[in-house]
Amino acid sequence: MKPGEYVLADAPVVCNRGREAVELSVTNRGDRPVQVGSHFHFAEANRALDFDRQAALGCRLDIPAGTAVRLEPGDETTVKLIPLGGDRVVYGFRDMVDGSLDPHEAAGLHAAPAAPAIPARHESAAGDAPSPLKERAGFDNETR
C-alpha cells in the first residue's frame, strides 16, 4: 500500500442498513430557501416547512453525514427519515425536546412511553404562510 492510496471494497457501502425509515412529504411554504442538515432533529426544522412533525419526532434525514437537503420556496419533496441513534438525547435546535426522546428511559421506568407531543409554540407556521407563488401584503417569515 502506498501513502494516500485508497483501497475500495468490491461492493458499495450501504448506509443505515436495517434502520426503519419513514417517508414524509415536505413543502416549503416560506419565501426563502430552507436547508436541513443530515443530523438535524427533523421535527424541529424551520417552521415554514409544512409536514407531519409528530411523525418526524426523534428522526433525522437518511442522507450521508455532512450533507443537507435544500428546499426552495414552493418546493414539495419527499424525504426519508430514520430514528436518531445513540442515547437518543436531544438538546438545542429549537428547544423542543431538551432531553431524552424516550421519556420512560430517562425516568428509569419500564412502562410504555406516552406519545410525545410537540408544544403548540413549536407547531408549523406553514399553515399561516401564503403560497410563495401568491404574495400577500404584510407577510413576514419570522417565528412568533
UniProtKB/Swiss-Prot annotation:
Main EC class the enzyme belongs to: hydrolase
Biased composition (Low complexity): 110-119
Annotated region (Disordered), positions in chain: 110-144
GO biological process terms, semicolon-separated: urea catabolic process
Keywords recorded for this protein, A-Z: Cytoplasm, Hydrolase
Reaction(s) catalysed by this chain's protein: urea + 2 H2O + H(+) = hydrogencarbonate + 2 NH4(+)
Hydrolase is among the record's keywords: yes
Subunit structure: Heterotrimer of UreA (gamma), UreB (beta) and UreC (alpha) subunits. Three heterotrimers associate to form the active enzyme.
PANTHER family, per the entry: UREASE
Protein name (record): Urease subunit beta
This protein's encoding gene: ureB
